[in-house]
C-alpha cells in the first residue's frame, strides 16, 4: 500500500505541499502504511514524506495470513490491544522521535512533536485511547 500511495503522492504532485504543511506543524497520525510514508529512512531506501526520525521496515509481519492481534503497553495509556495486518515496524529511532510501544522487541509506535505513527490498526478495536492520545498531542496536553 505505501508503494502505491507514495507513487500517487508523486504523480499528483502532493508530496511537496504535504511536506510543507507537516513542516509548518500539521498534526499527522500515520497508521501502518502511513508509518512508512512519514519515515525518514526505510529498509528498501524508498522515502516519501521524510518527516519522522525513524527507519521503517515494510511488511515485517509477513503476508495477510500472518496478521495477528496482541496486547502491549502503550506509553501513557497502559495495555492496549494491537491489530497487525502485514504491518511494518520501526527498526531505528533517533533525534526527537520517542518510542511509545514495542512488541517482541520491535518498535510498533512512536511520536515526534505532533506526528504519531503506529504499525498496528487502532481503528480495528473498540478502544479509542490511542486516538485520544493523538488528540491530546494536538492540544499540547501530552
Task: List each language-model region with its residue ranges.
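Pocket-forming structural segment of enzyme catalytic cores
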Residues: 42-106
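A conserved hydrophobic position in a structured secondary element of the catalytic/binding core
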Residues: 31, 85, 126
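Flexible gly/pro-rich beta->alpha loop and the following alpha-helix that scaffold active-site loops
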Residues: 1-30, 36-42
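Structured helix-beta-strand junction loops
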Residues: 24-25, 52, 113
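C-terminal and late-domain segments of enzyme folds
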Residues: 89-142
